[in-house]
A protein has these predicted regions:
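Bacterial N-terminal signal peptides
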Residues: 10-23, 367
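Noncatalytic, solvent-exposed loop/strand surfaces
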Residues: 24-455
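Short N-terminal alpha-helical targeting/association segments
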Residues: 2, 15-17, 187
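Bacterial N-terminal signal peptides that target proteins for export
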Residues: 1-13
Length: 455
């Protein structure tokens, strides 16, 4: 009895401490797509509408190239960008944008398709550490207080990795004491777990043994996979952790499809083929989990979306629906009260802003956001954008610098406010970041902070 009581007290204390930590971090945005990686913030007290010229500007700053979003935690903002021939990890005061420290290392990355040469992955922040993954696959752990290197792994040298299309762009996942990275190594190092404190390899899995001989589900004739040593594995989606039927899953939307792994051992739970028919294609949307279902989507060559239902044992999935109502390129939908709010379309002329019922795949409403790319004048449309949810409002960043505020309304596309952010132009492909009532927007050359606090 004493043992049971003592255990109960220990669990209660642990829960209490955990609740305190959550409360302290509720206004933070310490990793890609927010504290829970779901494009949502728990903040309230935000402006209900914006002036015509936009909300109050706090500060703005010229930054280097890249698509990496800033992360904010414990009074620190960290941006990963490239200046000339160096990738720079820069810690700033989130209230002013002033530099606190920088950490630099050489980079020779050149994008083969002409996009910018900066980092694509977003920093992960803890109380005392910062983890970054560069465009060439250099993985660093840096001290948050002084910006000094703690450890480094050069994944391109440590693993056999075919060159990625647009550089390394899958932000790692910190799960307990493991840093889980979609490395993309051959033949079976598609996903690698590193010890977060030391950088040592804990486990590696996914590759030839996962896909070789599998049917290419959804392809005409459903041919079998014949694995090649030059197969690219890493996608531009980031690993997602989820608890389904009481079991913890690491969900990785690889270039070939979705794989679920046990976070402790790396053992596969299940996999599902999901890839466009042509080589020049990518998967870039993070999986979205609701209950025992998982949504995956892509925009290349009519692949569309699939909702998968996980079996109670957690070792298999079945298709619930397959639809082209959402064809998502590089953004991740916001799930709110059973509906998905997202930008659909591969290219600028295909762009739509849509609401889709997650359980059925039914298109609820559709708004045309298509435009023809031009550098002469900013478009009035959002194009392909990103959205986050806070205070029952959707904050939308269009790819040419249009910033919008929407009500998440399944009845209609209810736009509250909209304005063109000065000095931001195409391509604005970085999702907005919200922390302590401050909105941070990043383009290829600017970092801008707005105050969204309601007076």
């Amino acid at each position: 009895m004493k043992s049971i009581c003592r255990k109960t007290l220990e669990l209660s204390a642990t829960f209490f401490l955990f609740a305190i930590v959550l409360d302290l971090q509720a206004a933070d945005w310490p990793r890609f797509l927010g504290i829970h990686a779901d494009c949502k913030s728990q903040e309230t007290g935000l402006l209900d509408a914006w002036p015509k010229e936009g909300p109050p500007l706090e500060w703005k700053k010229v930054v280097g190239t890249g698509y990496s979003a800033p992360s904010v935690s414990n009074g620190n903002l960290v941006l990963h960008h490239r200046i000339k021939k160096e990738e720079v990890v820069e810690s700033m005061d989130p209230s002013t944008g002033k530099t606190v420290w920088t950490f630099k290392y050489p980079s020779n990355y050149i994008d083969p398709f002409g996009y910018n040469n900066g980092p694509r992955c977003t920093p992960i922040l803890t109380q005392d550490r910062c983890y970054v993954l560069g465009a060439e696959g250099k993985l660093y752990c840096i001290g948050m207080q002084d910006g000094r290197e703690i450890w480094m792994r050069d994944t391109a040298k440590d693993f056999n990795i075919p060159e990625a299309f647009f550089g390394v762009g899958s932000t790692p996942l910190l799960e307990d004491d493991k840093l889980i990275v979609m490395v993309g190594g051959q033949p079976d190092s598609g996903v690698v777990a590193f010890e977060a404190s030391t950088g040592k390899t804990i486990w590696e899995n996914v590759g030839k043994k996962t896909w070789d001989g599998e049917r290419k589900t959804g392809w005409r004739g459903e041919p079998f996979v014949q694995w090649q040593e030059y197969e690219k594995q890493a996608s531009y989606a980031s690993p997602v952790a989820a608890t389904i039927h009481g079991q913890r899953h690491i969900l990785c939307l690889m270039r070939q499809g979705l794989v679920s792994l046990n976070p402790d051992t790396g053992k596969e739970n299940f996999h599902f083929w999901f890839r466009a028919r042509v080589n020049e294609s990518v998967n870039a949307m993070n999986p979205v989990v609701s209950g025992d279902t998982i949504l995956i989507s892509a925009a290349y060559y009519r692949i569309g979306s699939v909702l998968l239902k996980v079996a109670p044992g957690g070792t298999s999935v079945t298709e619930t629906w397959r639809s082209r109502a959402l064809e998502i390129h590089w953004t991740t939908p916001v799930l709110h009260e059973g509906n998905l709010y997202a930008f659909s379309g591969r290219n600028e002329p295909d762009a739509r802003f849509r609401c889709v019922e997650m359980a059925t795949g039914k298109l609820v409403w559709d708004q045309d956001e298509s435009w023809r790319k031009s550098y002469l004048a900013p478009p009035e449309k959002y194009g392909r954008g990103s959205a986050i949810l806070a205070d029952n409002k959707l904050i939308v960043m269009g790819e040419a610098g249009q910033l919008g505020l929407f009500r998440p309304n399944p009845g209609m596309a209810e736009e509250i406010s909209k304005f063109q952010v000065p000095e931001m132009k195409y391509p604005c492909w970085t999702a907005p970041v919200l922390s302590n009532h401050k909105l941070y927007l990043r383009s290829e050359s600017r970092l801008i902070c707005y105050d969204l606090k309601k007076n």
